[in-house]
Amino acid sequence: MVPCWNHGNITRSKAEELLSRTGKDGSFLVRASESISRAYALCVLYRNCVYTYRILPNEDDKFTVQASEGVSMRFFTKLDQLIEFYKKENMGLVTHLQYPVPLEEEDTGDDPEEDTVESVVSPPELPPRNIPLTASSCEAKEVPFSNENPRATETSRPSLSETLFQRLQSMDTSGLPEEHLKAIQDYLSTQLAQDSEFVKTGSSSLPHLKKLTTLLCKELYGEVIRTLPSLESLQRLFDQQLSPGLRPRPQVPGEANPINMVSKLSQLTSLLSSIEDKVKALLHEGPESPHRPSLIPPVTFEVKAESLGIPQKMQLKVDVESGKLIIKKSKDGSEDKFYSHKKILQLIKSQKFLNKLVILVETEKEKILRKEYVFADSKKREGFCQLLQQMKNKHSEQPEPDMITIFIGTWNMGNAPPPKKITSWFLSKGQGKTRDDSADYIPHDIYVIGTQEDPLSEKEWLEILKHSLQEITSVTFKTVAIHTLWNIRIVVLAKPEHENRISHICTDNVKTGIANTLGNKGAVGVSFMFNGTSLGFVNSHLTSGSEKKLRRNQNYMNILRFLALGDKKLSPFNITHRFTHLFWFGDLNYRVDLPTWEAETIIQKIKQQQYADLLSHDQLLTERREQKVFLHFEEEEITFAPTYRFERLTRDKYAYTKQKATGMKYNLPSWCDRVLWKSYPLVHVVCQSYGSTSDIMTSDHSPVFATFEAGVTSQFVSKNGPGTVDSQGQIEFLRCYATLKTKSQTKFYLEFHSSCLESFVKSQEGENEEGSEGELVVKFGETLPKLKPIISDPEYLLDQHILISIKSSDSDESYGEGCIALRLEATETQLPIYTPLTHHGELTGHFQGEIKLQTSQGKTREKLYDFVKTERDESSGPKTLKSLTSHDPMKQWEVTSRAPPCSGSSITEIINPNYMGVGPFGPPMPLHVKQTLSPDQQPTAWSYDQPPKDSPLGPCRGESPPTPPGQPPISPKKFLPSTANRGLPPRTQESRPSDLGKNAGDTLPQEDLPLTKPEMFENPLYGSLSSFPKPAPRKDQESPKMPRKEPPPCPEPGILSPSIVLTKAQEADRGEGPGKQVPAPRLRSFTCSSSAEGRAAGGDKSQGKPKTPVSSQAPVPAKRPIKPSRSEINQQTPPTPTPRPPLPVKSPAVLHLQHSKGRDYRDNTELPHHGKHRPEEGPPGPLGRTAMQ
């Protein structure tokens, strides 16, 4: 029996929780050590603090408590003896052991899995084992059994060793070598019992069995090592894709242990199968040239381009192969203009209008033209951008890519073979966020396919996948990895040209069924390096059943903890920190948590596509919101129907009932099949599609697809020699401290890990201080070591990340891990940093301080993913671009007021939405237009604080609420408080908290804006925006005849209050310096009682002064407005007519339209203050319609 105080592989935080519940000094438990294999940790509670002592085994498998130098060590043959000894007083511990904390009773009330053995009782979750579970190893806790329980009589049966000896004697062993037979007998007689002890204590190690198998396989391993090179040479001989000059990498034979043996045998069988396939393909198809290009036919898009307010239809033809963008006025007409790929500088997506795109092109006279087009829908625009990116990539002069596209697919096949045609899955066609037809011919760089309940063999499934991809892309993809656990499988395929860019391939699996061995649930994973970027992929099948949510959560934690992928040097970090990009997908089995009697109501909502109502009850979204699973992961918005449980061979009916022996079982329609991802901070990743197919119906699940753009780095070679002065880079952390949620009484130190460091760096111990709410604050001050990167070129160093682990000095166990990006907008400057700390998937605290980065001289080249940017215009409506939510704000830095003033911008200064808070980037403008700051655009310091991300979960995660009832969805005006806020993280454009701006209920009309250059479209009611007369004096511009002002984007909590920004803008309006503040007058004639419409940004407390909005485009030259005195402002009364400011030059048609309807608008009774004068030519302020609602 395992003692009640032995808790096996529970986490440190769980141990602290159990001890804290008892509240008694001397309470104790033993758990497995997280830092040393086969070691244990003795945890003792004393005065509400947890003290941890390490229990180490020696070479003779005797146990001792690690002690300080000079203290004599006591050894014990069993853990029980050690615990009994330290129950005595004054034995060296902080207090003697008194109250053992028993194991928690596991919830066994749920029905067993449909496909598992019901008669087996499920013990606590343990790590994967290397041998089948025996009866003795199942006894995980002391439970009183009745006489009817057959296990109660196990003590009267022969021992396991005797039983196996009898079995060995009955076997024919005449063919066994004598030394092998003797080794087996020795193992059964003495060593089996010792291995059994390891199993009982929850260890996954069986050292004596490994020694036995190593001895038995010694000669076989040598033969395999000698045979493999010959087979590999034969395989390369028939490989059509391999370059002739490529030489195989030398392989160093590893140790002849069972793990290496299994790996080599698997490699041997795979090679034999591969050689046969390659010879067949070569004889059938003949040799083909390596890196055969895929031909993408020209694609034509019908768009609208507006001129003087009149839309004109045009044709944009993208010829990827020739590298041209052709512009035609009619589909069958001659070419009007064309631009080569070198002349196309940038694509700028409108954030508010999802079908609008700006193209920046360079003319022959080296001028920059800004061309605006409106596509039929957002999918067409996205397809156009992908084709242009493909063109840029195809004709790029860079030897290595800096962005790749990844396809992720997950499908529970329901133990049924697939249909003949599954290409819609790989084309991302069906429901949800799908790809446009124009992108069909663009192959992804990497395809990752995860299946569950897969009835096919690996060879059969691989042939189907490759054939389907070749049918739609004309590319023969290379197999990177394939790994199977029971019926859970993951396949990774890559383009042939990427074969030599992929290295360090690793596969692993974790069982999460009954006792971690029985059943069919678990996970398989693959990881590899793509040049300098680490990628990880996990396909999991979690426990089924709507009521088993907690067990699913535990499945996730076990996979997270025990899946061994990636760089083994990153031992303190689990898979969520080991990869630049980690993708987790599969049949996660989280359900819609509603009563069974609402089944028909659910189906009706699905038919009406009311997914938001159902997603508010989605278990996975709820658990993520409460930070119980998938902490800091991302998921694209779900806009497709639930993928489970359908009647087979149709997608029109959900089969939500199933008759079982125990009664009727309900499986309400749910989104069981999901794709989530987690990337390092400030790394480019955009989800381009997320949906499910509608035509693959052999299973009760529908396949789910997701596609991503992901930034990658190359294997960088420094241009500077190691001896040059400017190559000495340095990373310095200053005034750093960690806040931990722990009751442990120990000292802490930091470890810094990174691929840019030669090896990890360890710091000195920090100073502990008591924090608020029982937290512990560990301050490191100026004692942290200065890190020396191996390469200091900024092109390399700014793409790197530093992984931080805070560890206990006593046990060397990690208490939290975090990640810091080195992509800083300024070097040689101290900048604030922040990262949350997590451990085993739980939030354990945070780390913050300052960083100073020193690089060598050099420039960073523009990345391919910078070619497509998102213009930060006004906050968009309900359908914002989801690419802007591709980073968790918890991963960003809390940086306050560090945006330097910006007086102008260039083409490359448009912020990438995935590089939130990086520098003072702003929107582009033609280079031949001189840029000047207007008084409304004085530089303002913005905060880069990133708040914890809770809001993005749910049906409308990260998006702004719908447009208020009285607010028109479209306005031709843009608003930008200042130039400096161009560095504001785009996420602030997506969230408009309802509590912001409540004191700014007064809706302020505003004047026409003569300072703007042509915007995305023109409206005749507002006049043409094509000319730029000089601005009117400020005194005249403040007259109450201006049209309604659009509400500016409201930042999330944690961002600098917009009231601060607007105050500074007001100071600029009055011509005052920032140090001299003038109170703004309250113009009551513009006060509006509507609280839901037209609020000024973020709570403008002055509430009175109407301000001229500044276009999100860069301003044109303008004279400084006349500064009115306070008396002049106060003398302005709305009923008194005031001189009108000069209006922009308008076309005759526009003037006629305004003159003919001006008085009707002026006299309209819907105006909020129809007693006030308005000029006839002025357009009606939209405020008039909203104030009455």
Swiss-Prot record:
Residue positions of motif NPXY motif 2: 1019-1022
Tissue localization of expression: Specifically expressed in immune and hematopoietic cells. Expressed in bone marrow and blood cells. Levels vary considerably within this compartment. Present in at least 74% of immature CD34+ cells, whereas within the more mature population of CD33+ cells, it is present in only 10% of cells. Present in the majority of T-cells, while it is present in a minority of B-cells (at protein level).
Reaction(s) catalysed (UniProt annotation): a 1,2-diacyl-sn-glycero-3-phospho-(1D-myo-inositol-3,4,5-trisphosphate) + H2O = a 1,2-diacyl-sn-glycero-3-phospho-(1D-myo-inositol-3,4-bisphosphate) + phosphate; 1D-myo-inositol 1,3,4,5-tetrakisphosphate + H2O = 1D-myo-inositol 1,3,4-trisphosphate + phosphate; a 1,2-diacyl-sn-glycero-3-phospho-(1D-myo-inositol-4,5-bisphosphate) + H2O = a 1,2-diacyl-sn-glycero-3-phospho-(1D-myo-inositol 4-phosphate) + phosphate
Post-translational modification Phosphothreonine, affected residues: T963
Post-translational modification: Tyrosine phosphorylated by the members of the SRC family after exposure to a diverse array of extracellular stimuli such as cytokines, growth factors, antibodies, chemokines, integrin ligands and hypertonic and oxidative stress. Phosphorylated upon IgG receptor FCGR2B-binding.
GO cellular component: cytoplasm; cytoskeleton; cytosol; membrane raft; plasma membrane
Comp. bias intervals (Pro residues): 961-971, 1134-1145
Segments of skewed composition (Polar residues): 931-943
Region described as Interaction with DAB2: spans on this chain: 1016-1030
Residue positions where Phosphoserine is found in the record: S243, S934, S960, S971
Modified positions (Phosphotyrosine) in chain numbering: Y915, Y944, Y1022
Protein name as annotated: Phosphatidylinositol 3,4,5-trisphosphate 5-phosphatase 1
Organism: Homo sapiens (Human)
